[in-house]
Every structure is written in C-alpha cells, then in structure tokens.
C-alpha cells in the first residue's frame, strides 16, 4: 500500500468516526430524552384522523395520549398555559378550526400515520422518530455528498449543523427536520445537475411546508435562463396545482389568518375569525420583528446568518461566467428563498427557515474548488 493510499484510508476512517460520533451526540441530546411541544398534539390528531376517525374522537385521543405519556406539569403547561391552549383542550370545535394549519402539511402527517402503523407505535413516538431519523439522514447525506472534500471542509459539516439548531430540531415534534432533509436532498440534486429529481423533491416539499412553493418558483428560473418555456410552464402549473389542491382538500385558513394569528393576536378559536386585511400592518410588523430579533441575543442569529450566507453566496457570482453555472446559484437561491419567506411571514423562530439555510450552507461547501484555491495561493 502506497503512502498516499494509507493517508486516504486514515482520513476516510476519521471521517466515518466523526460522523458516528455526531450521530451518538444527536441521539444523546434528542432521541434519548422525553420531549413534548404543543404542535405535536394537532399532528397526532391529524394522523389519527387518517385511520377514519372523526374530529371529536381524534381530539380526545390526542389529548388522552399526551396525558398518558407526559408528566403532569408538562401536560398542564400544554393544555392550559394560555387561553388559546385552554380553548384547544376544552373544545373540539375550536381545536378543529385550527387543525387545517397542520393538516396542510399532508405529506408529513401521512408519514406519521405510516410510521405509526408500520412500527406499531403511537403517533407521538412516530413524530419523535421522524424528527430524529430526518436529522441522522440529513447528516449522512451531507457526509456522503461531501466525503471527497478535504478533512477540514468535511468536518465543518457538523458545527454548521449544530449552529443551525439541528439538535433542538431533532427532538421537536414538528416537520422542520423532515423539511430540512428534503431541502438538502433537493440541493444535492441541483448541485449534481439532476434538475428533474430536484424539482420532484421540491414539489413534494410543498406538502410539508406550503411556503416551499416560493423556493420552488425560484429554482424554476433555471428553465427561464435556458429559455425552456414549456418546461417552465409545466412545472409552474404542477406546483400551483399541488398547492391549491392541498389547500382546498384540507380547507387551509389562508395567508392572512395565518399571518395575523401568528404575529398579531392568536384567537381562542378560528370559528368566525376574520381579521381585516391591512397592508401597512405587514410592513410595520416586519420592521418591528426584525428590530426586536436583532436586539435579542437568542434570536439575532437568524438575520445575521441570512446576511452572512447572502454575502458568501454572492461572492463567487462576481465573476460573470459563474452566473451561467447553475450549481453556483444554488446557495444564493436557498438564501433568497429564506429571506422572501421571512419577509412574507416574519416568524421569530429559526426552525421555520433552518432547512433553507442548512441547504445554503452545505451547498457553499460543496461549491468550494479546493484545487483552484491552492493554485491561486501558489
């Protein structure tokens, strides 16, 4: 065995060990711990309804299952910490009026149902398993896709994932880690010039978070750049069809009710809830939330990371030839997608946009041409 092969083997083993240590770390900090958050309850009810049960029984099932699995203090917090939660707990009608916000994540809810049925575990366990498995698969995909990079670049995957809040996402009973897996899966397809597969994953992701249609539309600019107008029309029509069919099937509460209830005032029930639309409120809320987040040490990571990633993704594009190379545009598109999504609904919650930023960060690493950097240094 030559010294070069020995070096390669040693580095490869170190890379594998690093990944396995990261998996163990994630397991210890997430899956091994019991954790419940409110959003898990309507997802459990939504998945239970796929068995043919109605709203009344699914409402009772979700809350009773939570009571049987959680500590009394946790249950009391999730059922009664606010007037909204009390209403969701006490009234199946109020609970059902907000359920479409969760049911429209239809691919995620279906995955919960399938995992629960296949493994014979309850829906809370299925939610927990999906979040953990998504993070493990995401980190594996990143490790595999970037395995041929230098050890220095390869090892940067893991602190980046930690910085992007992957540990709390691994234990949250929400679709955020699942969405992040889909985002980076699509990114690897676009980076590998497999656009059809990338579009397919992006279309599926609309059924996990409907705002992903924004990112899908941005990637369709590839077809516009190449003047493939029929493909552009086809994919755009397919994306809109999936979006509106999903919204119609689950009676989505719509953009403005989501915006108002999340950022202005959460009602105790969505029955009869119809706040008047105010365009000026969108602008003032965006400025107010951004100003608050920048001054908050727990929240300013997100706008700072968006600006850093935007700068880094624009840096290679100063060379005109790079604008013609689609894989060079991938980090930029993911970052712009996060910025637009935040501008439309500025949730002060990093996990909502983490999938976009994880994909942007890892795509930047994938695009680093180490040989070219070495040649320039010489």
Segments the model singles out, each with a brief description of its role:
Residues 52-104:
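Interfacial juxtamembrane loops and adjacent helix segments
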Residues 141, 178-197, 359-363:
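Specific aromatic-rich, kink-prone transmembrane helix
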Residues 140, 292-325, 335-339, 360, ...:
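Hydrophobic, aromatic-rich transmembrane alpha-helices
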Residues 187, 196-210, 215-222, 238-241:
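Membrane-interface alpha helices of multi-pass inner-membrane proteins
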Residues 229-316:
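Membrane-lumen/periplasm interface segments of specific transmembrane helices
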Residues 94-106, 110, 118-137, 301-305:
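Loop-to-helix entry region of an early transmembrane alpha helix in multi-pass inner-membrane enzymes
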Residues 125, 140-163, 181:
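Transmembrane-helix signature of polytopic, membrane-embedded enzymes
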Residues 168-178, 349-350:
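Short acidic/glycine- and proline-prone juxtamembrane loop motifs at membrane-interface regions
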């Amino acid at each position: 065995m030559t010294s070069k092969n020995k070096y390669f083997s040693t580095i490869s083993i170190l890379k594998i060990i690093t990944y396995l240590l990261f998996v163990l770390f994630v397991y210890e900090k997430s899956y091994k711990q019991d954790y419940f958050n409110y959003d898990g309850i309507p997802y459990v009810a939504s998945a239970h309804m796929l068995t043919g049960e109605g709203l009344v029984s699914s409402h009772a099932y979700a809350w009773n299952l939570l009571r049987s699995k959680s500590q009394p203090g946790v249950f009391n917090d999730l059922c009664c910490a606010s007037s909204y939660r009390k209403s969701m707990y006490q009234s199946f009608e109020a609970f059902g009026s907000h359920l479409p916000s969760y049911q429209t994540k239809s691919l995620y809810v279906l995955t919960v149902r399938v995992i629960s049925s296949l493994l014979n575990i309850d829906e809370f366990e299925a939610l927990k398993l999906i979040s953990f498995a998504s993070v493990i698969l995401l980190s594996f995909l990143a490790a595999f896709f970037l395995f041929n990079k230098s050890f220095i670049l390869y090892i940067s995957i893991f602190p980046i994932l930690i910085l992007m809040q992957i540990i709390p996402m691994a234990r949250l009973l929400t679709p955020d880690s699942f969405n992040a897996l889909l985002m980076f899966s699509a990114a690897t397809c676009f980076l590998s010039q497999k656009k059809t597969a990338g579009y397919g994953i992006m279309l599926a992701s609309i059924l996990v978070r409907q705002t992903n249609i924004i990112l899908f539309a941005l990637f369709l600019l590839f077809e516009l750049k190449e003047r493939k107008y029929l493909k552009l029309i086809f994919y755009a029509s397919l994306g809109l069809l999936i979006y509106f069919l999903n919204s119609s099937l689950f009676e989505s509460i719509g953009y403005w009710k989501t915006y108002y209830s999340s950022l202005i005032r959460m009602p105790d029930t969505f029955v009869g809830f119809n706040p008047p639309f105010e365009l000026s409120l969108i602008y003032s809320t965006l400025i107010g939330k951004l100003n608050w987040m920048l001054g908050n040490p727990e929240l300013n990571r997100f706008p700072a990371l968006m600006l850093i990633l935007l700068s880094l993704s624009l840096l290679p594009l100063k060379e005109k030839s790079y604008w013609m190379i689609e894989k060079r545009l991938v980090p930029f598109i993911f970052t712009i997608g996060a910025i637009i999504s935040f501008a439309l609904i500025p949730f002060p919650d990093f996990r909502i946009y983490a999938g976009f930023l994880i994909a942007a960060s890892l795509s930047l690493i994938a695009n680093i041409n180490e040989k070219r950097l070495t040649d320039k240094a010489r």
